[in-house]
């Protein structure tokens, strides 16, 4: 496809993006082998329960928390990797905001749908203070509530002097696997400001040494991922020192995140929950519209669904 063809599609199409975990690199880790580990662990826990599996489950959740969730905390955001990742997202927002503004068509709305399987806050962070309209689906200001109907709205701007009205670009952010700052309350998804506090507190109470390290550290300091069997062996060793029930509080707090955990069953989990089902429906409807274009960024399509 040449530039002329691409320009035509941008001018005349409904624009959609699908953004995966690779887009948040190098600051945040990709899933790596966590999906395979959790899937196999779930199979073992379904067939027979033993305390070692609970310890392994907590350890894998903690590894995912440390590498993907915890770095989104405000005091973690620093360094070259963070700056590079944030800049990449800002360039994305600036470029497409300009392109939507320059659209000649008055038939198409100046909206761009950003569908993402990422649960991190990098896009929200990048948009903060830029003067760009990012619609994350929440309505209200004191206790914002998630409502998919918000993605059906357009934003108009009226000039001060001539009362001329024009549509301004809006980025709809549809997080189809949930988000770390989502919380459940009275059958609603609400915006959670203190999303990491309770998990952090449980980790502090327990200490890192109660979790299996998912990596082998070589004599040269290089890390290599442990096999599933090695993780279970590590859990068996911890089982001799700690009661499996000591991990309950951490697992309970972790599972309060309104996210789809990385397992091969995640598609089944997604369609069973009302809000995730609605987001998948919006994704499907967006692609079925006439003249729809989907750009895919940082998405490997490596998992089964």
Regions found by a protein language model. Give the residues of each.
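Extended, H/D-rich, highly charged conserved domains that either
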Residues: 108-261
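Extended, folded domain segments that form the structural surfaces/walls around functional sites
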Residues: 27-30, 34-37, 220-226, 304
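Gly/serine-rich nucleotide phosphate-binding loop at the start of the catalytic core
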Residues: 1-143, 166-169, 174-177, 183
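Active-site-proximal helix-loop elements at catalytic-domain edges
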Residues: 75-82, 250-269
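SIR2/sirtuin-family catalytic core signature
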Residues: 1-17, 23-27, 110, 227-250, ...
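Short linear motifs at secondary-structure transitions and domain/linker junctions
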Residues: 85-91, 143-154, 268-272, 294-300
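A Trp-anchored, charged/polar loop motif used as the substrate-binding/catalytic surface
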Residues: 1-3, 93-99, 151-160, 271-282
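Short amphipathic alpha-helical segments, especially helix-boundary/capping motifs
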Residues: 96-100, 255-260, 282-285
